[in-house]
Amino acid sequence: MALSSESTAYGTSSLSTDERLSSRSGAQRKWIKWGGFGAGIIAVGLIVLKTSSVSASTSSTVATATSDEGDVTCFQSSFVNNVTNMMAPIKGLKWTLGGEKKTKSFISIDVDTQFQEIIGFGGAFTEAASLQFNRLPKHKQEEVLTLYFDKEQGSAYDFGRVPMGSCDFSVASYNFAETVDDIDLVNFDVNVTHDTETIIPFLKRALERKPDLKLFLAPWSPPAWMKRSSSEYTASMLGSVKPVGLRDDMRASWALYFSKFITAYKKHGISFWGLTPQNEPEFAAPWEACAYTPEYQAEFIGEYLGPVLERDHPGLTLMVYDHNRNNIQHWAKVIYGHPTASKYVHGMAFHWYEDGADRYMDGVEYPEHLNETHYIDPNRFILASESCNCPGVAFGKDAWFRAQRYGHDIMSDLNNHVAGWVDWNLLLDHTGGPNHKNNLCDAPIILTENGDDFQIQPMYYFIQHFSKFIPIGSRRVHVKVAAHFTKPGDPQLYLNYQTSLATCDGSSRQALHKTNDNKMQVTNTPFCLNMVPLSEGQEIRLVECQWTQQTWTFEETTQRIRLDDKCLSLNDKSTMNGVRVTVDKCEADVKPHQQWTFKDEDGTMRSQASTENQCVTAGYSFVQASAFVTPDNHKVLVVMNENTEAAEFQVQVGDAVLDTEVLPGAIQTYVW
């Protein structure tokens, strides 16, 4: 069964159920999910939203609150009892000045403690996205442009990412310097002919709507003749030799290629704001790829790319890395500290994927690496440059899960000094393509099979809860989240989840106990805390208790929990909310960050280092929040509740309080 061809409307989403696709995706996702939603995509009788076509001139369902509706404008997107309600206004919210402040369930905001400045949100103009845009009738193209770039009726995107040459989301591999060993690029296609048929027309239409759209480019691969071969690999745009794919003698030519590409786009009236030297430099992908080490990329920037850009295109913003969170801090240390590259680099770009893990882990791993990267050089920014849900196009509860993952990822990034967030494909076809290596994925807008209309996925609205209300120049401000649930809810745990220390909230993720065979189990689930080895050190992951033979020693006199010479610890000895629980070598002197207690009265596990009400949490806290002050001094609070129970809490700002709640699995944005 194909995607429904029913017309689209702003304020709706596609949550139709396709049992064939559900079955296929369930088979592809080999993971364990413990909880009420079950495993994989569950094909249930969902309400299929049938709405009339809405032209670009029609008002959005996102209303503007008037003075008699309350002091606070609020919008909520929810999926309860198989019914979606997207960007629904919650009216009548009013502050109580001097009201009694709750101490058990609250979110407090300190607008005077400010952090990074926001530089924007956006998506990618891939060839796949451009081809789908071109398939749509003109009036539907206008709707897409409104949905993404209009401030009043859309998501107010600020950024566009543009592949330099082909990527996996192209129909086939291509580049603009096909002549082998043309080191001076005399035969470079200065018209960038291939892109004039796809990407450039889409960009021009977007720029008509958003003239100040910030575009940044990223290459997936140089032409094959610029790349290294080996005994096991013949140079091609696909794949790469590791650890370095670019030939030493082609670095000057490759740097010149960047300059000529930027110049060619300028001749079409399209200017770039910035670039990265390479997409995912640590991954020798089966599609277009070129591996780099941080040291080699630093040398390429310092000796070749940086000087060429400074000469030909001064003022461009250069970001490095453009890969997963796992190693971002290492790349920042190397390149920021490099004697020639450092002066050309403005910041770091990164992706949401988790190296080598199942895709349900994307967006939840290693947020502390972003925090560490910020403090390596607080004067340089961090940009989330790619996120994408795979495999295929999701429906039903799995589509909502993917939207929640986006919301969680954006929230986690922003709370760890990230200045902006950019999605991957702006739109794709009904299969999640085209992709010439069959790496099919989801997108916020999915075309119907016949290509005359589109469906809006829930993730579109989760992005909009941030992008629409947090303009460029906004500042993140301090938030303390101390929500508390009256019912614990479904733990919704996954194999290999990490474990953290967070404010005690009464949820099922914070119920842990010591078993009779000396394991640490999440109560009423099959999961235990398990030590796993890394290339350097170890960490704690969730595993099914029946599959681990680890038995921990619980030292009554020291309150340490040890396995051989390793003790359960807090990462970096920190008690910051959300800090990871890990393992380190047991210290000679017993320290609080390696001391733990189990509280029988509430079934929780605590750290002796914490001076606040914090509990060991399997995964992460269900309630997350970020707050901002905009350039016109509006305040914005985004709250997401991933529990299966509603979150009731009090918002506290100065001497003003507001009692409110977020529905199960929902996201809200407050503006005042």
Which positions does each model-derived feature cover?
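Short, low-complexity, Lys/Arg-enriched N-terminal segments of secretory-pathway carbohydrate enzymes
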Residues: M1-Q28
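N-terminal signal-anchor transmembrane helix specifying type II single-pass membrane topology
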Residues: S22-A56
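Ser/Thr/Pro/Gly-rich low-complexity linker/stalk segments immediately outside membranes or between
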Residues: S53-S67
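Substrate-binding and catalytic surfaces of secreted/luminal carbohydrate-active proteins
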Residues: A65-I109, L215-L217, L256-W273, A284-D490, ...
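N-terminal catalytic cores of secreted or lumenal carbohydrate-active enzymes
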Residues: T84-F272, T293, E303
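Short, solvent-exposed turn/loop segments enriched in Gly/Ser/Thr/Pro and often Arg
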Residues: R161-D168, P219-P222, T276-N279, D322-R325, ...
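Short acidic/His/Gly/Ser-rich catalytic and metal-binding motifs that mark active-site loops
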Residues: F169-S173, P223-M237, P281-P286, I328-H330, ...
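Lectin-like carbohydrate-binding module/patch detector with strong preference for beta-trefoil
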Residues: R476, V481-G619
